[in-house]
C-alpha cells in the first residue's frame, strides 16, 4: 500500500520513509498539489496523501477537497507543527487523520500507520 507525500523536498522524508517500509507501506512523492491529477489518483489510488508543511490553511483545504473530489476513499494527513486541535479545526469535515509532526521520524511513520489501522485502512 502506498503513501503519496506531496512535498517540495523529498529528501527530508528519508527516515519517515524507512518507518513506512518497516510498517509494510511504501511511499512515492509529488512536488506540488498541481501534480495530483484526478485521473492518476483514480488509476493508481494511494492509501493516503500526506501534505508537507508548505501546504497549510486555505491551500491545504482546497487541495484536500480536490483529492476528495477525485476519490473520497483516499485518506489524508498533513505535516505541521500545529497542535492536534488547531489542525483539526483547519481541516474539519475533510476526514483528515491526525497530523504528522515536523520531525518526520520513523516513529512518526509508525504512528501514522497505527492511525490507518484504527480507521481500518490497513
What spans do the regions from the language model cover?
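Two-component/phosphorelay signaling modules centered on CheY-like receiver
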Residues: 10-30
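The C-terminal output helix
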Residues: 114-122
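Conserved phosphotransfer microenvironments
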Residues: 46-71, 81-84
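Acidic, metal-coordinating helix/loop segments flanking the phosphotransfer/catalytic sites
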Residues: 31-48
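Conserved acidic carboxylate
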Residues: 7
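Alpha4 helix (beta4-alpha4-beta5 surface) of REC/receiver domains from two-component response regulators
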Residues: 80-100
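C-terminal output helix
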Residues: 86, 104-114
Amino acid at each position: 500500500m502506498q503513501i503519496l507525500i506531496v512535498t517540495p523536498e523529498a529528501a527530508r522524508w528519508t527516515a519517515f520513509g524507512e518507518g513506512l517500509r518497516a510498517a509494510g507501506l511504501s511511499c512515492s512523492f509529488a512536488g506540488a498539489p498541481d501534480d495530483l491529477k484526478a485521473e492518476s489518483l483514480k488509476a493508481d489510488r494511494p492509501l493516503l496523501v500526506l501534505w508537507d508543511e508548505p501546504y497549510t490553511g486555505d491551500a491545504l483545504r482546497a487541495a484536500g477537497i480536490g483529492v476528495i473530489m477525485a476519490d473520497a476513499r483516499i485518506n489524508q494527513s498533513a505535516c505541521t507543527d500545529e497542535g492536534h486541535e488547531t489542525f483539526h479545526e483547519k481541516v474539519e469535515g475533510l476526514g483528515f487523520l491526525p497530523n504528522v509532526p515536523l520531525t518526520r521520524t520513523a516513529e512518526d511513520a509508525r504512528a501514522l500507520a497505527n492511525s490507518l489501522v484504527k480507521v481500518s485502512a490497513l
